[in-house]
Each structure stands twice: as structure tokens, then as C-alpha cells.
Amino acid sequence: MNSAEVNVNPRVFGDSFVTFSGNGSGKFEMIDQAEAFLMELDSVAADTGSDGNGNVDLGSRVSNSETEPRFCEMKREIRDSDHRFYELCNESGEKKMEKRRVPDYKSFLSEFDDYVAREKMGSRNSKALSYGFEVGDMVWGKVKSHPWWPGQIFNEAFASPSVRRVKKMGYVLVAFFGDNSYGWFDPAELIPFEPHVKEKSQQTSSDHFAKAVEEAMNEVGRRSALGLTCKCRNQYNFRPINAQGYFAVDVPDYEVQAIYSSKQIQKARDSFSSVQTLAFVKRCALAPQECDTDSLKSFQKKVAVCAFRRAVFEEFDETYEQAFRARSVYCLMKTHEPLNRAPLRVPLSGSLVSAETLGNPKSYTKAMNVKDSTKQDKYLPKRREEAGDMTVQFGQVQESSQFQGINGSSAWDRLLQRRTPCLQTPRKHEQTGLVSMNFTSSSGNIPGKKSSVSKLSRDDDKGLAQESDVRMGEKATLFPDQEKFEPMKSLKQDETGTNSRSNKSSLKLFSGGKFSAGVGIKKGNVVKRSSGEMKSENCPPEPKKKKKEYVSELNRDTPDKRKALSSGEAWAKKSSQVDSAKRRSNMLIVKLDGLQLLSNLLALSLDPLFGSSDRSSFRVIRQFFFHFRSHVYQKSLATSPSATKLSKSAKTLCRANEQSKAGRNRISSDSQQDVPSTKKLKKTIQFKPLASDKKTNQDATKRSSLAPLNPVRDQCRVPINAKPAIVQQEKKTGPSAMVVEPTMLVMMFPPGESLPSIDLLKARFGRFGQLDQSAIRVSWKSSICRVGFLYKLDAQTALRYVSGSKSLFGNVNVTYFLRDMKASSASGDHELKKAKRPKTDKPITKPLNQLLEQAPPVHQPNIQLKSCLKKPGNNRNGNHRTVRVKFMLGEKETESPFSVSILPLSSQDSEPKPVNNQVDHVEPPLDPSQLKVDISLQMMELLTRCNDAVANVTGLLGYVPYHSL
């Protein structure tokens, strides 16, 4: 409705007009006119009264009958006007309320928009504030498939649009250390950094995690030094940036361009307490070892003390250098030098990670710790880095190990390392003056010595082992108790090259009393010998060995020793120059340490929960005794290496001289005439063990010839020489593990079915073991395939497989069975097959009768074919004839004319009968020679038919399959 004036028809009540208007003033106007109208009604009523006698004056007034209906009508009109008056008043009130409500609603919308804008721009910090977090706080966040990772709550105003695009309502942006990854996390799933740093930093020993924790500790130190950084010496230390209330700060000795808000800077300045700092310095002066703990508070106080000294005292103290006659080194630092340096770490430059949904953080943390500890135990030998890096780490963490002993963790030791000052090298002289007990204080901190902190932290040269040995000697004079825990440190690093060699002498002193190398060092084993050798323990000492004897003994020694001598040759030369008194002192220290570890082991056996509060001590004890057991007891259970070597040579000798195996190998090779190189290769392989056996026998004769020259040594070595002889006899009599026993797998296909090719047979059966390539046959006439295996076990495995698989060659009913590849069984099978088939009976009897007529004495030894073929003699002439034998596989019927032409060969072979040995070895090839006649005839016919077939199909599009020929 519009606000224009609404006029109602005016009515005349007496002499007055009543006008209703729609505006606000119409209300009062109507009230005044209504009062005037009522007063007029009263006067009318008074005028229409009677006189004193009760008579009504009708002359000048209207009669009573006329005035009453008029009076009722006027009352009705008044009632209607009042009703309309209230309606108009209500309408005007609603209009006014509407006018008032519109600006109120608009103001409410503006307030809501402001609230939403504040929520988007930074009011999500209100949710973080409810959990006690602010922008810039350091936290631990749980990333999927990762342990709790250190990070800090990052201001999203500094993030790129791609990072802000994936933000979630009510979540905070967390930038992680190490890999510079980031993610949006619910504040309820974050935990503060400082209260949980001791627990969370020991989750795993991964290099990436250790790097992240190290960067987090670096940030903690920088924030501690931030409160003592000012613009007195460098006016560019605090530079405002585009974001309001934030500054780019360059803290000395730390990376440049660290972004902090004014609130963080003020908080860092307020956290510095001069009283507490002075008390900490006094406590360190009175009890340095008690003060030098690995807690986070102690680390922050040390950084604050160093920052206070840097802020108060001169930056370059010339008097200090003059007093100690040190060379003056000035850094040519300009006032604008920090502007030229770039920050080493770029936040949010990594990948986006997603948070892991946590049900119960406390129980989950406990489970994570148990899981990670077991995983760390499982992969403990594999978690070390290169040898050069481990040498640096060993030198840096040595002094912190004397306070935490075996309770320390490698990740915690690494994260507390103080990084080298960048571009401000003279300040390291100032720090060594007051605080000498730093977490990674090295020999460079000693006054008068050259500082080597930066060299230790950055030098990756492998030749650093000798330098670390010198530093260890220097530290032993300052901290005598420190060497007690050095063997345990070496145990943690025994997988690396340099550290395992550096501590090998101390470990072997404790295990067997043997040094690694050196002049005049005892060579014989003490603990690793068997029980038979221990009886000759009291024999007189050995004289100095000659060069040949020393080399032969090294060859008889274990492979592990040879490997250790070859790998640690350079280190042995360096260790030979160490003083003998220092070796004896190290031996005493190692023995004391061993007693302590032994007591811990006894306590652990009595109380299984011993060391449950500190898993690292339990790991060190267990690892030490594992290595001790492997060095002392493990190799004494097995046979001596010399016996093993001689037994292997005995196996080779038996395999070379066994007659039946050699005979079988020669009989089963069918294609040696066609491939002479294969025959030569087999000959060289067969006679190689003979040469090695000859060499072994020559060494044995040399040692036996040297026996009169060294009676004392032979007397001590009697058990060693006796045991290999016994083992060798046993090895000769007993069967070898893998004896070459050629076995043939025969597959009989139904007639008319397609047969697999030789390549297919090799591919199908090559997986089961080594095949005899020359024994693989495919016979199309008889529908038989043969596959030869060198070992019977492989053939049996293949038979089990093909018997269980019905679809190896399709849906074909194939019969499988094994056959021994012996000449007797092969010839017997051929004769049986020929006897079964009536077509081949006559061709077989004719050549046999002819042989009986021409050479009757030769038929008698034919009964002994089995025994002769099993044990052929050493005569090579017979072997050559055996090589040229071929079997008949096609089983084609034979004809006598061709066999008659070959009969002179058999008569010539039967000529040297007077010599019994030659006759025995020449007789067996007679029967295969007859088979050779049959094969030649069949091959001639086959070649003739092939020639005709090829001539017939020349120029045609197709060809006839081979089996139809």
C-alpha cells in the first residue's frame, strides 16, 4: 500500500465535518472531531428536553418521534466510523512496522555477511583456538600410511590459489617439515609439538622422518633465538612484507627470510627470562653432565644462552683470537648480505597429503609405537646409510651417548645435532668459550684445536675413518667413561663398511681374542674350532710361516675370513699402527662392557619385562648377543671349510670316474656325429674335475712332503687332517644329493593326432628341470614323443604334472610313462616292439642269423649286455664307437642287403679278440650297429620320398603335412 493520504467521504454531524486521512495526523484529527460531535449530541439532547411541568416544547424543536430515529441512526454511524477508524489505524501501524523492519533486516544481513567473511578469512582460527592452537604453532599431524609427522599451522594468506582451492570449512592448513608437504587438518586431530616431541620422535628410524624432525628442532631453536634478535647490528633483520602484521626475519646462524607475525615475535621476546637463564648457566657450570640432558627445554635454554651471548658481546672478538694465538678470520659480511641469500626450505612446495581419521588417538598412538618398534627391530640391520655418512654420524653422536647410554635412539641423536653456522664461521669460536658441552660437541670445540664441525657434517669422503679414529683417541682423554658405550654404538653401525671395520678389533677381542690384522698377530682360531681341535689347544706356538704356507692356509680358510681380509686390508694397515697399550686398555674396557651386558641379559632372563620402559636398551642387548653368538658359536656347528671343500672334490671325482653314468651319457647322445663341437664341449666338461682333482692331490702331496719340516705344526693339526679324510671316505661311499641319472618321459599319442613340435616340448617341460637336448624325439609314424631329463627327480615331477593335467596338448588321450635311458633297456624295448609287430619279425631274424653264421663267438658276450653297458671300461676307443651309435625311432622294417654291406665292420671289430679287455668293451656296440643299418636305410628312403614330394609341390600354393609322407 502506498503512503498517500486516503480520504473518506465526509459526513456532516451538526456544523462540523469529519475527515479521515491515511497519514499519521489523521488519527488526532478524527479524535478532535469525534469529541466535538459528542458535545453537539449532548447539546441536542439538552435542547429536546421538556419544561418544568413535563410538557415538551414542540414549537421550536423537532418532535420526539422525529428525534429518536435520528438519534439511533447517529449512534450507528458513530459505531461504524469507530470501527473504520481502528482498521485504518492498524493499517497505518503495519506500514510503519514494515518501514522499520526493512533497515533492521538489512543490518542483520550485513552482520551475517561480515560474520561469514570473517569465518572465511580467518575466523576458522576460532575453532583452532578452542583446541588451543593458533596460526604459527608447531603440531604433530597424522598422515595416511605415515607416522605422526611434525609441522606448523600455516597462514593460508601466504598459500597459492591451488592450495586454497582445496580448503575445507573449519580446517587449518598444516605445512609439514622434511618433504614440504601440506594438508588441511581438523584441529581436533592435531596434537601440540613440544609435549610429545620425546615420544613421537622415536616412532621410526627412516631417513625422511629423521630429516623432518631435525628441521622441526631447527625451527624450535630459531624461535628461541628470535626473542633475542634485534636490529642493532643489522637493520634488515626485520623486513615488513605484503601481509599486514608479518615480517621476514633473519635470525643469525639460521636460514633467512623466516616469516613471523608480530604476535609471535612478541611472544618469543616475552618467553625469555633472565633469571631462569642465569640459573641455567650456573647449573651447567656446577654440573655439566646433569645439565646436558636431551630434553626440549634444555635445548631451548642452550639456544637462548648462545643468542644472548651473540646479542650482548662483540661479534668478532679479537682478544680471544690473540689470547689463543688463533688465526683471525673475518667474514666479509655486508649489511645487505641477508638479502642476497635464499631460504633453503620452501613451505608448501611438496605434495598434498590427506589426514588419517583417528578414532581414539591415545590407543592408536600406543598401537603405533608397538608396531613401529617391532618393525624397527625387524629391519634394524638394513636401516643404515653409506659408510661415509655413518662415520660422520658416529663422530657427532659419540658424546651425547655418554649421558643417555644405551637408552638413546638414533633418530633422537640425529635430530638434536646442531647444524653448522652458515657464512658466519668466526662465531664458532665464541660458542666454544662458554658452552662447551653441546649436543654434538666434537674435538673442534676444544680450545687450541682446529674446529671440525662443518667438516664432520659435510665431508662424505671415505678416508674419514682414520681422522675419526684420531678424534676418538682425543676424546678418550677428556671423557674416559665414554668408551664404555662405544662398542654398543659400533653394534648399531656394524652393517656399514667403515664403522664395522673400526670396531672389529674390539669385537673379536671379546669374542675370540683375535685381532683383525697386524704384525705378529696370532692367526689360529680359538673359539671357532670344533671339539676335536680344542684338545690340541695347549700345543706350543707356531713358528713364523713361510709365504707359500701362509697362502695355502688362507686358501683353506673360510670364505668369510678371506672376504674380511680383502675388504678390510686398508683398515688393517692403519690399525696395525695403534699402540699396544691402547689395545690392552680397549680390551679391558670391552670386557667390562661385556660383563655389564651379561648382567643385563641375566636380568632379562629372570624378568621378561626388564627394559620394557625403554625399548632401545633391550634392542642393544639383544643385538649384541646375536652378533656374539654368530661370531662364536654359529660356525663351530658346521663342518670345517677344508673338509667341505675336499668332500666337494670327492663328489666331483666320483661323478667323473663312475662308469655307468658316463656310458649312459654317451649312449643317449644321438647327434654327436652331426655336431662335433658339442662332443668336444662335453669332453672338456667331463675332464675338468679330473684336472681339479689332480691339483688337489698335488696339494695333498705337497703338504705331506712338508710334514717332516714342520713336526710341531703337524702335531697340532692332526685332528684337522684326520677329519677331512674320514669325511671324504664317507662322501665317497654315500650317494650324492643330485646324481645325474638320465630319464626319459615317453608320451604315446593316439594314431592320427597331431604331435607337438620339439620347440613346444622344450617350452612345456623346460620348467621342471634341465633337459637333455639331444634326447628329445618326435616320431610321427609311431605317434610317440620322448623328452630326456638329466635328473630322475625332474622327470618324476614332470610325470606327476602331466598326469594330473588333461588339457596339456588339448583334449587328447595321451599315455605318459618314464623310461630309464640305459642302453640295455633301450635295446630291450626296441626288440620287444619289433617282436610285437609281425611286419618287423623277418627283417630282424635275417641279420641276426647272418651275424651268427659269420661271427659265432661274438654272440656269447651278447648275454652280458646289461652288465657291460653299466660298467664300460676306461678304453676310449670303445667310447668313441659308442658315441657314433644311433637308435631306430621310426621302427621301419629293415632289409638285409644294406646290413650285409656293413657286416665287415663287425668282423673287423671282432678281430682283436685275444685281448679280453678290448673285446669286452667293443662287443656292446654290435647290436646298435645293426640298428644303425636300419636307420640308414630308412633315412635314404625318407630322403628320396622327400625329394619327390618337394619336386611335386614346387610352384603350388599349399603343401602336404609331414606325417602323411
UniProtKB/Swiss-Prot annotation:
<feature type="region of interest" description="Disordered">
    <location>
        <begin position="526"/>
        <end position="577"/>
    </location>
</feature>
<feature type="compositionally biased region" description="Basic and acidic residues">
    <location>
        <begin position="481"/>
        <end position="495"/>
    </location>
</feature>
<dbReference type="InterPro" id="IPR000313">
    <property type="entry name" value="PWWP_dom"/>
</dbReference>
<dbReference type="GO" id="GO:0006355">
    <property type="term" value="P:regulation of DNA-templated transcription"/>
</dbReference>
<keyword id="KW-0804">Transcription</keyword>
<feature type="domain" description="PWWP">
    <location>
        <begin position="135"/>
        <end position="196"/>
    </location>
</feature>
<feature type="short sequence motif" description="Nuclear localization signal">
    <location>
        <begin position="546"/>
        <end position="553"/>
    </location>
</feature>
<keyword id="KW-0805">Transcription regulation</keyword>
<protein>
    <recommendedName>
        <fullName>PWWP domain-containing protein 4</fullName>
    </recommendedName>
</protein>
<feature type="region of interest" description="Disordered">
    <location>
        <begin position="649"/>
        <end position="708"/>
    </location>
</feature>
<feature type="compositionally biased region" description="Polar residues">
    <location>
        <begin position="657"/>
        <end position="676"/>
    </location>
</feature>
<comment type="function">
    <text>May influence gene expression by regulating the function of the PRC2 complex and modulating H3K27me3 level.</text>
</comment>
<feature type="region of interest" description="Disordered">
    <location>
        <begin position="437"/>
        <end position="507"/>
    </location>
</feature>
<feature type="compositionally biased region" description="Basic and acidic residues">
    <location>
        <begin position="691"/>
        <end position="702"/>
    </location>
</feature>
<feature type="compositionally biased region" description="Polar residues">
    <location>
        <begin position="905"/>
        <end position="919"/>
    </location>
</feature>
<feature type="region of interest" description="Disordered">
    <location>
        <begin position="905"/>
        <end position="927"/>
    </location>
</feature>
<dbReference type="GO" id="GO:0035098">
    <property type="term" value="C:ESC/E(Z) complex"/>
</dbReference>
<dbReference type="InterPro" id="IPR052657">
    <property type="entry name" value="PDP_family_Arabidopsis"/>
</dbReference>
<keyword id="KW-0539">Nucleus</keyword>
<feature type="compositionally biased region" description="Basic and acidic residues">
    <location>
        <begin position="456"/>
        <end position="474"/>
    </location>
</feature>
<feature type="compositionally biased region" description="Polar residues">
    <location>
        <begin position="437"/>
        <end position="455"/>
    </location>
</feature>
<comment type="similarity">
    <text>Belongs to the PDP family.</text>
</comment>
<dbReference type="Pfam" id="PF00855">
    <property type="entry name" value="PWWP"/>
</dbReference>
<comment type="subunit">
    <text>Component of the PRC2 (polycomb repressive complex 2) complex which regulates histone methylation on histone H3K27.</text>
</comment>
<feature type="compositionally biased region" description="Polar residues">
    <location>
        <begin position="496"/>
        <end position="507"/>
    </location>
</feature>
<feature type="compositionally biased region" description="Basic and acidic residues">
    <location>
        <begin position="549"/>
        <end position="563"/>
    </location>
</feature>
